[in-house]
Regions:
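Non-catalytic, well-ordered alpha-helical segments in soluble enzyme domains
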Residues: 187-204
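A cross-kingdom feature strongest in bacterial/archaeal respiratory oxidoreductases
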Residues: 64-180, 215-392
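Short, solvent-exposed helix-loop connector elements
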Residues: 6-15, 174-180, 202
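Alpha-amylase-like alpha-glycosidases and glucanotransferases acting on alpha-linked glucans and related
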Residues: 176-191
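A glycine-rich, hydrophobic/aromatic-adjacent loop/helix-cap motif
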Residues: 1-93, 259, 267, 277
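A generic secondary-structure signal for well-formed alpha-helical elements
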Residues: 31-38, 146, 153, 197-201
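Short coil/turn segments at secondary-structure boundaries
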Residues: 4-10, 37-44, 204-208, 232-237, ...
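A glycine-rich phosphate-binding loop feature that marks nucleotide/adenosyl-phosphate handling sites
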Residues: 40-51, 206-221, 238, 360
Length: 392
């Protein structure tokens, strides 16, 4: 028989989260079925629609972004560390790197006060830059902490094109309403800024956002036609709003690592050895005490003062932190799931407003009881907006 080891993405979102993934790969290698149909290992099945699909990827209309002239970077989880320690050093993948001294933060298209792992610490670090600029349609925690907020349009206030690599559909997304208040498209905001910096023509090429959309699509139309793929011209797409392209994305015989299994010398993996590495000499040479050159078990951090273990899954009623305003219409607080035995031991009941805390911070939540939650474990979905009082 065949065995597929299916691993949830969530395992990495913990201290030493690399190890369970690595060990799962080792186990799959020991079973000897990597590269066979129905065998091996997979990640994130059921998370999004195209995971595990035996399909090619479609290349839709794209905007040429050029090359970023700045090669330096930091891991995204180290934003607070960087702001709090300008010029300080840190370890990353065996390298000793140095934090830059950031004077200005310009944030467009994200919300760090949702996805950062320690919001109280980020809140402190956010005071260090001289200027923070944010594009936002909503009055988020990030926008509230900016020096300058450029009100940006939503997808309903601008035109665009939509497509996905694993889907044969392409959409024209027409502007539905006029921009609310002083809101502008991100492109128009940057266009006006480029004018202030005397480089507007270089940035815009004298084209509006709608003209860019048409030109990008026309280039895609020509490339598709040259490849024998028939797609609608731009004006027809605008009339129909969407199209299912005449391209067959199915590829029934696709098996991950099939070619590697057949001929590992001709089709090496992207590891230093080109093989599945149960032991990694490269990682061993990093000389990190808790990360040897092989997957290992590290005891979880436990504190007798905080006996409950918190899980933070994705919410069923929001997309990450989006749509929070709609949730607040029915419940102003996040919901904490707890086993009835743990609730009885603490004298609390379903629907109670409770305070949750540890050494890093605290929050309020509405209690919900579930027999399916293990005793000693509680669950509160991610996505509630950061809104601390004077005590944090």
């Amino acid at each position: 028989g065949r065995t597929l080891i299916s691993i949830s993405w969530s395992l990495q979102r913990a201290r030493y989260g690399e190890h369970p993934f690595w060990m799962a790969c080792v186990l799959a290698a020991m079973l000897g079925q990597i590269g066979l149909p129905g065998g091996g290992i997979g990640f994130g099945y059921g998370a999004i629609g195209n995971i595990g699909k035996t399909a090619k990827r479609m290349q839709g209309p794209l905007f040429e972004q050029g090359t970023n002239p700045i090669s330096d970077f930091i891991p995204v989880s180290r934003i607070a560390d960087m702001l709090l320690n300008p010029g300080g050093s840190y370890n990353f993948n065996g390298e000793k790197r140095v934090y830059p001294d950031i004077k200005l933060v310009y944030w467009c298209g994200g919300n760090p006060f949702h996805h950062h792992q320690d919001l109280n610490r980020l809140n402190k670090a956010w005071q260090y830059p001289e200027t923070i600029i944010v594009h936002e349609p909503w009055w988020t925690a990030t926008a509230k902490r900016a020096d300058i907020v450029f009100p940006a349009t939503t997808q309903f206030e601008r035109s665009d094109i939509g497509w996905a690599k694993g889907d044969p559909y392409i959409f024209y997304m027409p502007q539905m309403i006029s921009p609310v208040g002083l809101a502008k498209n991100d492109y128009d905001i940057f266009s006006e800024l480029s004018g202030k910096l005397n480089c507007k023509e270089k940035f815009t090429h004298n084209q509006s956002s709608d003209e860019w959309i048409k030109n990008i699509y026309d280039k895609f139309y020509k490339q598709s036609k040259d490849q024998g793929i028939m797609v609608l011209n731009f004006e027809t797409l605008k009339e129909k709003n969407f199209e299912r392209m005449s391209i067959d994305l199915n590829e029934e015989d696709y098996v991950p690592f099939k070619d590697f299994r057949k001929d590992p010398l001709a089709h090496p993996l992207g590891t230093p050895s080109g093989k599945i590495e149960i032991y990694s000499e490269k990682i061993a040479n990093f000389n990190y005490p808790e990360i040897p050159g092989h997957p290992t078990y590290n005891k979880p951090f436990l504190d007798k003062n905080f006996p409950l273990r918190l899980l933070s899954p994705q919410p069923h009623d929001k997309l990450h932190s989006q749509l929070q305003a709609a949730v607040e219409d029915t419940n102003d607080y996040a919901v904490l799931m707890m086993n009835p035995k743990d609730a009885n031991a603490r004298g609390i009941s379903r629907g109670d407003l409770i305070k949750i805390w540890n050494s890093r911070g605290s929050c309020l939540a509405t209690l919900e009881l579930k027999e399916t939650i293990l005793p000693g474990v509680v669950s509160m979905a991610t996505g509630a907006w950061f809104s601390p009082d004077e005590d944090g």
